[in-house]
């Protein structure tokens, strides 16, 4: 092979290897990407059904109920405008309480219930996840606007 052909072969091989690496990285990133939705967005059908996402807001007062097996829980997450029912099987974080901030990760089913795989509670008295705080503010503004009309 001539030096020019060797150089072109090396360049072609390098570009091919780089393309494969980029495709693998993007594929891994896509499979681990989890979006956040507020209860209002979920109620408006903006969240995907059957795909994993996070929902955040406040645990609705009086909504926490344990099933007979002791590990399955039913509760509702609200952003003060909409309420989404959640089912979770597992051990809840110690700071999980009604009326407090929470983020749940899981999938929305066709029956309108969010089946959580993971539940995250706030970690101190004043903390609320930024996404959940923003969703609560937007819901409050929307509620004020609808009342004013």
UniProtKB/Swiss-Prot annotation:
GO terms for molecular function: heme binding; metal ion binding. It comes from the Bacteria. It is found in: Cell inner membrane. Keywords: Cell inner membrane, Cell membrane, Cytochrome c-type biogenesis, Heme, Iron, Membrane, Metal-binding, Signal-anchor, Transmembrane, Transmembrane helix. It is a single-pass type II membrane protein. GO terms for cellular component: plasma membrane. The chain crosses the membrane at residues 8-28. InterPro entries: CcmE, CcmE-like_sf, NA-bd_OB-fold. Residues 29-149 are periplasmic. Residues 1-7 are cytoplasmic. Coiled coil: none annotated. Pfam families: CcmE. One of its GO terms (biological process) is cytochrome complex assembly. Heme binds at residues 123, 127. Heme chaperone required for the biogenesis of c-type cytochromes. Transiently binds heme delivered by CcmC and transfers the heme to apo-cytochromes in a process facilitated by CcmF and CcmH. Belongs to the CcmE/CycJ family. This is Cytochrome c-type biogenesis protein CcmE. The gene is ccmE.
């Amino acid at each position: 092979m001539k030096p020019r052909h060797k150089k072109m072969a090396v360049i072609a091989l390098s570009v091919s290897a780089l393309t494969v690496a980029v495709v693998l990285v993007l594929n891994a990133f896509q499979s681990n990407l989890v979006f956040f939705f507020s209860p209002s967005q979920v109620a408006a059908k903006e969240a995907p059904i059957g795909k994993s996402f996070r929902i955040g807001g406040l645990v609705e007062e009086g909504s926490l109920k344990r099933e007979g097996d002791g590990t399955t829980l039913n509760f509702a997450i609200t952003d003060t405008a909409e309420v989404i029912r959640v089912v979770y099987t597992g051990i809840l974080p110690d700071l999980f309480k009604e009326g407090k901030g929470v983020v749940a990760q899981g999938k929305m089913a066709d029956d309108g219930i969010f089946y959580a795989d993971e539940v995250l509670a706030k970690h101190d008295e004043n903390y609320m996840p930024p996404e959940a705080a923003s969703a609560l503010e937007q819901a409050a503004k929307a509620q004020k606007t609808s009342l004013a009309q």
